Amino acid sequence: MGVDIRHNKDRKVRRKEPKSQDIYLRLLVKLYRFLARRTNSTFNQVVLKRLFMSRTNRPPLSLSRMIRKMKLPGRENKTAVVVGTITDDVRVQEVPKLKVCALRVTSRARSRILRAGGKILTFDQLALDSPKGCGTVLLSGPRKGREVYRHFGKAPGTPHSHTKPYVRSKGRKFERARGRRASRGYKN
């Protein structure tokens, strides 16, 4: 009698479409599905894959980070492409002239980019502008930037751990004695 094949782990876990029911996002997916199929550029495949992603995997990109990345050598006169949101950064004093394509741009970031003489494209305009992704720079925000990542890692309280504990309150009596000071048992 043969051993049956174990089928419980042979499902490939990856998105084939966005979870969102947003009709405008679905239209973009239709467009980039076509482009990914009909053009031989990896750019369109990457954009399509990122359109499927969950919101936590499409973190917002700040204006300052985008400016820093676009100042790198060889990136002059290129379009910054962000499959996500571009947010304003008040720490930036002057914004250079930028050409940007994003799913969303917050109102303050939008006004600052346009005031600097920049241009903001949507993804359907980008598809007409550069269908193969020529002259573009794909950027994304920091995925590990969310506060929740501070709680991940080595258990808090163990040596050399910088993991943030989940604490009810940040008061004097909460996780401040044993393991935090030498007079109370030990100090890590």
From Swiss-Prot:
State its location(s): Cytoplasm, Cytosol; Cytoplasm; Rough endoplasmic reticulum
Q: Name one Pfam family in it.
A: Ribosomal_L18
Please tell me where this protein is predominantly located. Answer: cytoplasm
Segment Disordered: which positions?
Answer: 151-188
Indicate where the modification Phosphothreonine is found in the sequence: 158
- Family matches, as PROSITE patterns: RIBOSOMAL_L18E (PS01106)
Q: Where is the composition biased (Basic residues)?
A: 161-171, 178-188
Keywords tagged on the record: Cytoplasm, Diamond-Blackfan anemia, Disease variant, Endoplasmic reticulum, Isopeptide bond, Phosphoprotein, Ribonucleoprotein, Ribosomal protein, Ubl conjugation
Q: What is the location of the Glycyl lysine isopeptide (Lys-Gly) (interchain with G-Cter in SUMO2) cross-link?
A: 119, 164
The record's section on Gene3D superfamilies has: 3.100.10.10
Q: Does the keyword Cytoplasm apply?
A: yes
Q: Name one GO molecular function term.
A: RNA binding
Which Gene Ontology cellular component annotation is one that this UniProt entry carries?
A: endoplasmic reticulum
Family classification: Belongs to the eukaryotic ribosomal protein eL18 family.
PANTHER family in the cross-refs: 60S RIBOSOMAL PROTEIN L18, LARGE RIBOSOMAL SUBUNIT PROTEIN EL18
Protein purpose: Component of the large ribosomal subunit. The ribosome is a large ribonucleoprotein complex responsible for the synthesis of proteins in the cell.
Q: What is this protein called?
A: Large ribosomal subunit protein eL18
